[in-house]
């Protein structure tokens, strides 16, 4: 369990060229896991979203180590979410002079880590 008064370290990746729905699919499986378990899970998941999420998770752990002096072995993912970013708009030419709009979504990935409680509450 993660205590509410414990220090947390965050990391964000902005304007990632990926749909937030596809990123949330991975983040939902990581929320509440330990840092090491999350890294192992990300390594073997078959999704493209795992690469940027791994980078953000490592950055959050580095922030916790450098800024707060926490041990990475005790870290738990307290928050993990993906917000929608701006859509890049492109146009595909179609018949008779028409054009269809193609939206290329982006997202902002945020992960926060906190030290794990020593007293586990069931």
Swiss-Prot record:
Any single GO CC term annotated in Swiss-Prot or TrEMBL for this entry: cytosolic large ribosomal subunit
Entry keyword annotation includes Hydrolase: no
One Pfam family linked to the record: Ribosomal_L22
Source domain of life: Bacteria
Ribosomal protein recorded as keyword: yes
MF GO annotations: rRNA binding; structural constituent of ribosome
InterPro entries tied to this protein: Ribosomal_uL22 (IPR001063), Ribosomal_uL22_bac/chlpt-type (IPR005727), Ribosomal_uL22_bac/org-type (IPR047867), Ribosomal_uL22_CS (IPR018260), Ribosomal_uL22_sf (IPR036394)
Keywords: Ribonucleoprotein, Ribosomal protein, RNA-binding, rRNA-binding
GO biological process entries: translation
Function: This protein binds specifically to 23S rRNA; its binding is stimulated by other ribosomal proteins, e.g. L4, L17, and L20. It is important during the early stages of 50S assembly. It makes multiple contacts with different domains of the 23S rRNA in the assembled 50S subunit and ribosome.
SUBUNIT field: Part of the 50S ribosomal subunit.
The family this protein is said to belong to: Belongs to the universal ribosomal protein uL22 family.
Stated name of the protein: Large ribosomal subunit protein uL22
Natural source organism: Thermosynechococcus vestitus (strain NIES-2133 / IAM M-273 / BP-1)
